[in-house]
Regions:
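Short, structured protein-protein interaction patches enriched in aromatics and acidic/basic residues
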Residues: 10, 32-56
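Solvent-exposed loop and beta-edge segments used for protein-protein assembly and interaction
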Residues: 28-32, 49, 62-64
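C-terminal edge-of-domain segments
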Residues: 53-74
Length: 74
């Protein structure tokens, strides 16, 4: 695949508890397996994650809506 960029974006409406469960599952992949797996177009991809990463957390609170953005990069 060389230097091809693979980007997966997913957005869905969930309950707060279901969203927390998705975040826990992602955290478990990082902590236990040192990687993140995802499926795109029927193919399974694995992103290996090094021992040290950069974590960015952004919280926006507004009258018309609020959001939390979490980004992990390496």
């Amino acid at each position: 695949m060389g230097d091809e960029l693979i980007e997966v974006t997913e957005e869905q409406t969930l309950t707060r508890e279901a969203a927390a469960a998705r975040l826990r599952a992602l955290a478990d992949q990082l902590a236990r397996h040192n990687q993140v797996e995802f499926v795109r177009d029927g193919l399974r991809y694995t992103a290996k994650v090094p021992a040290e990463v950069t974590l960015s957390v952004e919280v926006e609170i507004g009258d018309d809506g609020s959001e939390i953005e979490v980004e992990i990069s390496w």
